[in-house]
């Protein structure tokens, strides 16, 4: 089973902004009481469950059982995220902590970041079956379930069950994010913290877009559909050459999904 990262497992753009702002704050204040590590990241992400696709932990627990029973041999992340590789590792490790299991076997990182080649086994920003085989060294005829919110033509063939999901996006207001952080007790001295972090995050010119209750119900329905498709993949082992469009029709605010190399670079988004 192969997962995309951004807008498939969750929505991590704002989290990335906050994480960068927090690191800058800790560095500028020369705070030795806070260690920037996986434990801190886990505590931060726990404050913002909205950034996780609904029931993604349940979905991963389902796949955990499949791996334990040897029904699923490998689980991978195949991403075009333009942040540092450690960013994807933080997110991967977070999920593994939540399910108490080392479920992911590999992260296939972006082909290039800022013009510099990162993942040496990749040949293109596009996700392709040939690059996947090359990077993972699995047999070419392996049956694969691939989940991504973008459709990549070269990831569609007779050996791939392609679950083309609706992108998951959930914005949080910056002030709300900072309030939750300050109320968490993670830092002992919050003096100037709000102003400093807010000032840093405003550099991104990020426009908050609220989410309706109806849209959140759609997200929950999509997650149920994902689980149904995974059941089908493991139960029948039937592979399809055409993508499974999981409630894409609900996506009335599609956000440049034809651009395959998703990035943490923020663009203005309007209602």
Language-model region placement:
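Alpha-helical substrate-recognition element adjacent to the catalytic core
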Residues: 2-116
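C-terminal cap/substrate-recognition subdomain and adjoining C-terminal extension
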Residues: 84-257, 262-269
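Residue-level marker for buried hydrophobic side chains located in beta-strands
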Residues: 1-3, 145-146
């Amino acid at each position: 089973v192969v997962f995309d990262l951004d807008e498939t497992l969750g929505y991590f753009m704002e989290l990335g902004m906050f994480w960068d702002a927090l690191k800058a704050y800790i560095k500028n204040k020369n705070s030795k009481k806070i260690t920037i590590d996986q434990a801190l990241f886990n505590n931060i992400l726990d404050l913002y469950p909205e950034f996780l696709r609904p029931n993604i932990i349940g979905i991963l627990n389902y796949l955990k059982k499949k791996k334990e029973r040897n029904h699923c041999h490998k689980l991978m992340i195949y991403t075009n995220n333009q942040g540092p590789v450690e960013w994807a590792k933080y997110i991967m490790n977070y999920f593994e902590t939540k399910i108490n299991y080392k479920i992911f076997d590999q992260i296939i990182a972006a082909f290039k970041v800022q013009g510099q080649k990162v993942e040496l086994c990749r040949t293109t920003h596009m996700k392709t079956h040939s690059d996947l085989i090359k990077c993972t060294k699995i047999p070419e005829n392996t049956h694969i379930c691939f989940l991504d919110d973008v459709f990549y033509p070269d990831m569609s063939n007779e050996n791939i069950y392609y679950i083309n999901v609706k992108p998951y996006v959930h914005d949080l207001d910056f002030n709300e994010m900072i309030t939750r952080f300050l109320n968490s007790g993670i830092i002992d001295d919050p003096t100037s913290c709000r102003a400093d972090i807010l000032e840093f995050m405003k550099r991104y010119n990020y426009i908050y877009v609220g989410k309706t209750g109806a849209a959140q119900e759609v997200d929950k329905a999509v997650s149920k559909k994902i689980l149904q498709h995974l059941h089908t993949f493991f139960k029948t082992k039937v592979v399809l050459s055409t993508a499974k469009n999981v409630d894409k029709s609900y996506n009335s605010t599609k956000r440049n999904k034809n651009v395959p190399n998703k990035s943490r670079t923020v663009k203005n988004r309007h209602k």
